[in-house]
């Protein structure tokens, strides 16, 4: 369910604005998206795991807040580009 450090490093290098940029909203959205997709796969086998379902909803809300910040701060073009790169809908 968690992300390996190698996967996290590859996400950081892909979405970072500057070198060693781990805190930008772009990177955080990418990491949250990976965690959400891992949890979604987990629920295919464990349908009644309600505690993890709550954690998933919290992660989705956190990603939504980061995406709203990106849209407000960097504009609609950066927002749309990030959504396409991540492969999420909105």
Swiss-Prot record:
It comes from Wolbachia pipientis subsp. Culex pipiens (strain wPip). One of the primary rRNA binding proteins, it binds directly to 16S rRNA where it helps nucleate assembly of the platform of the 30S subunit by binding and bridging several RNA helices of the 16S rRNA. This is Small ribosomal subunit protein uS15. GO terms for biological process: translation. HAMAP family: Ribosomal_uS15_B. GO terms for cellular component: cytosolic small ribosomal subunit. One of its GO terms (molecular function) is structural constituent of ribosome. InterPro entries: Ribosomal_uS15, Ribosomal_uS15_bac-type, uS15_NS1_RNA-bd_sf. Part of the 30S ribosomal subunit. Forms a bridge to the 50S subunit in the 70S ribosome, contacting the 23S rRNA. CDD domains: Ribosomal_S15p_S13e (cd00353). It comes from the Bacteria. Keywords: Ribonucleoprotein, Ribosomal protein, RNA-binding, rRNA-binding. Belongs to the universal ribosomal protein uS15 family. Gene3D superfamilies: 6.10.250.3130, S15/NS1, RNA-binding.
